[in-house]
Amino acid sequence: MSAALAPLVSIVTTDLAAVTRGRPLTEARFRKALETGIGWVPANQCLTAFNTIADPNPWGSSGDLRILPDEAARFTTAATGTATRFDMVIGDIVELDGSPWTACPRTQLRAALRALEAATGLGLVATFEQEFTLLPGAAGAPAVPLHAFSVEALRHFDPFAPRLAACLEQAGVEPEMVLAEYGANQFEITHAPTDALTAADRAVAIREITREVARTAGARASFAPKPALDQVGNGVHIHFSLRDASGQPATFDAARPGRLSQAAGAFCAGIVKHLSGIVALTASGVPSYYRLAPHNWSSSYTWLGERDREATLRICPTVTIGGREPERQFNVEYRAADATANPYLALAAIVRAGLAGIEADLAAPPIVGRDPSVMSADERERLGLRRLPETLEDALDAMAADPAVMAWFPPELLASFVAVKRSEIGLMAGLDRAAVCAAYGARY
């Protein structure tokens, strides 16, 4: 870090296009902003991923807000290789009197978690697995694809992976792995489980730090669901488990199907019931639905499976090596998500759907061990397996058709979200799928 340059602290929020935006301050100015925040504009929430403002939108050109920084969500590292350190503080969008702004996604996740705790006494532990691609043409990109998951694929871009791991560790993200994935130039990052709000904060920090480290290496990192039509897609897999009021695991019950406790089974049932209605909030881009198709190792049906990576909800395995007990390991993975979705809004939708399942005392969904796409229509109907929406437009329509989902979030937030997404659909109209993938690949 250069002694001649004072690092800037960026106070940020992540909008409905899942783009992290904000304003930078010197450290001295940041200390002063802790109490009153920085200025923000309601219409900023209606920016698309393509730097247009969705029109019409609920806000127009009027209104003023503040982004109030949360020091617990400060992510700092001096290991990126840049002249000044990376320093980002996530905040909540509030009104001028400090009261919550209803269209702030982080506020909505906090509200969903409070509702879960108030109704059930339960909390949620979560972690985000995120895949990304170093774009073709990146400095040092191999002339031919390297072996999936191989040491060679990881080491080819050295020191990218160790530098990224060091940055994430220094920033307090608790990275578990930075690994070469299945696709060409594809990587995955995992972090340690934590409370749900912190997990969403970490998801944001991981994306921004990864982009920073890639840039300093002369590359670009894309978290887009399909960076190119003929390439493997990038997913965001959201793992979750329940905890009781004392912090003890509440997801595991060895005597029940799938080892899901009664509460966890009902939670999963709520998600499955409302999957079609929430998928627009968890997979929010036009090319998201090129990825959510059978035999893509992603998700395509309203399906609870055990250790099956095509199930939308996957019951994850536990390890007994060394006498380890399963309770604290046991978790469920939501797989119909990607980085076009705001992580706070995606997790809030999962929590709200799960809570609805508990409140309705829904029975756990059947655990399906076969590929729904090869079943007869009658068999799928009997098992409650419905095809997920196949386009973003269909997903928005499914959300609008689910009155429960529409009631979970403030009308202004949903109107803004729909405006942004329909604007993006319009911007992609007339482009073929390859061009759509290229457009999103460059933006995410």
Q: Model-found features: residue ranges?
A:
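Structured core elements
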Residues: 10-12, 24, 90, 133, ...
